[in-house]
Amino acid sequence: MNFKSIKDVESHAKQLMTKEYRVEVNGRTHLLIPSKLGYRFKFDNAKRRFGYCSYRDKEISLSKPLCEYNLDNFYQINDTILHEIAHALSYKIHGSRGSGHSKRWVHVAKSIGCNGKRCYDSSEVNNIEHKYSLVCDTCGGNYPRHRKPRRDYSCAKCEPKKFDEKYLLRVVQNF
């Protein structure tokens, strides 16, 4: 199964947010629904991470650009949503001890059907092209960037210890 549009992703995420999840911890059963815990779903414009869970704002967000770029990868998008839901549930069950990618979080993640891995494997998803590159004319080094740099950089391969104008990197717009 693949998503046909970003609206399908949103609908699926909201459906998973209203589902009841059963988590067993130390012989105690927790039945939790993310939306009933106050969590909302939204998209953001991140280009380097697929998902995010904010305990303070009670938001679970997905990268709209990465989702649009990977509509044909149901498994990855679904697992990312479950990954972020696992953060919300683990925080509810364990408090700050359950945040991050601790063993407690992995247990919760696997309990709800997530693979329990910290990050997605870049070979499994389509990554967004970098709009800019910093190029060294001396060694040919190439440093991809999503945003145009606001200051000058020098090549770390040619002069790793300090900034050196002799090895100034040239900004190239890729598209």
Question: Where do the model's predicted regions map?
Answer:
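Active-site-proximal or metal-binding-adjacent scaffold patches in catalytic folds
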Residues: 1-79, 88-175
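Walker B catalytic acidic pair
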Residues: 84
